[in-house]
Amino acid sequence: MLGCDTVTTLQPAYKLLPFSHDALDVTDSAAVEDCFRQHQPDSVLHLAALTNVDRCQTEPDRATAVNIAGTRNVALACRRHNAELIYVSTLAVFNGDAAEPYSEDDTPNPRSIYAKSKYEGECIVGELVERHFIVRAGWMFGGGIEDKKFVAKILDLARQRDELTVVDDKFGCPTYTVDFANAIRHISESRRFGVYHAVNTGSPVSRFDLARRIVEIAEITSCTIRPVSSDTFPLPAPRPRMEAGVNDALAAAGLPIPRPWDEALFDYITSRLSSS
């Protein structure tokens, strides 16, 4: 999902060596070390992660293996080979109790196994790799036909059903993979190491209002979106009430700020529909 758009965005300017899970298992420390010895990278973008929040909750050992041990393997290899590391994380590292979006200065307090594993990954990167970037995303969408996240699911379901119920008490910042990949490029080129949020701008939006906007852009008039409480859909993993962030570090560094999420959402949906 993010990997495809990152390769497309960065390929013209950089020599990239993308690895699928089949090609490189980050939980295999020997394989990671062999890869570094063979290719001697200057910079590593660490995208490998178990991101299914509920699967992480029900399979904590797997989440630990991939998101924590895997990240440690990559970070140690970066330190041994003097490579800088770009680590992609999530705004879910915050507990979600705040009334306003989170900044990079706020203290993480993750609740779910997934969020805890990603935050531990952040700590590992910060401890082991001197030259590092930690870049947090919001509610990700993008990746074309490979997209299986919320936006793509709503698009598909709304064309199949007369009515959808969507929770209206969880808020976040949609983050377009294309814009996130561009932010990674700007952050890396800045040489200003540290922690960044890179989310599309705009007011935090509920899942319900986001779903309504999705069907509006797609001009799907046959499906009604109805609001419900998240208590209606009990899930294995807890979700933050507020999962939105602000791009204070980008602004402080004088780097480009991602465009409004509504504009990005419109471009993504119209592009997806035109290619389907």
PLM feature segments, named:
Residues 11-34:
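Adenosine-cofactor binding site in Rossmann-like domains, unifying the SAM/SAH pocket
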Residues 29-66:
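NAD(P)H-binding glycine-rich loop region in Rossmannoid oxidoreductase-like domains
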Residues 44, 58-86:
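NAD(P)-cofactor binding segment of oxidoreductase domains
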Residues 5, 183, 190-236, 241, ...:
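Mid/C-terminal beta-alpha module of Rossmann-like enzyme folds, strongest
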Residues 19, 44-48, 85-91, 135-137:
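SDR active-site strand-loop-helix element
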Residues 65, 69-73, 80, 93-135, ...:
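Catalytic helix-loop patch of NAD(P)-dependent Rossmann-fold dehydrogenases
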